[in-house]
């Protein structure tokens, strides 16, 4: 059975992907910050917390990545700031999360012992 890390797993795409992969027999770990902007009701978190290993953390934080990649075979990196309009005036934050977090992931994978064999990256239109 494969271990899959999904960043942004409590978002719309991540939530639906998580359910599908669990149905197919995968072990899922989610790394998500549960941003109030996206997850005001936390309904997806409530549905996922008992069927996944759920890490409430930040994809811009090295320690959260190091914790999340432990024993993973695949990373599906969906975490991103969303909203094209907001990305036009909150440039630093969007760049930090949507580009910087991916760089952080690659740095952690390159410089630590891990079992990750595949990365799937889905980007936001707000990059």
Question: Where does each model-flagged region fall?
Answer:
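N-terminal Rossmann-like NAD(P)+-binding domain of SDR-like oxidoreductases, especially those catalyzing
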Residues: 1-127
């Amino acid at each position: 059975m494969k271990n899959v890390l999904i960043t942004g797993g409590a978002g719309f795409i991540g939530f639906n992907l998580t359910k599908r992969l669990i149905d197919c027999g995968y072990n899922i770990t989610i790394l998500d910050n549960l941003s109030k902007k996206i997850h005001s009701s936390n309904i997806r978190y409530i549905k996922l917390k008992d069927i996944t290993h759920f890490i409430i953390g930040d994809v811009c934080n090295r320690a959260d990545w190091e914790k999340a990649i432990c024993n993973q075979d695949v990373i599906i990196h969906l975490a991103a700031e969303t909203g094209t309009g907001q990305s036009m005036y909150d440039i630093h934050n969007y760049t930090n999360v949507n580009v910087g977090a991916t760089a952080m992931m690659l740095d952690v994978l390159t410089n630590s012992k891990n079992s990750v064999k595949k990365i799937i990256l889905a980007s936001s239109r707000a990059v």
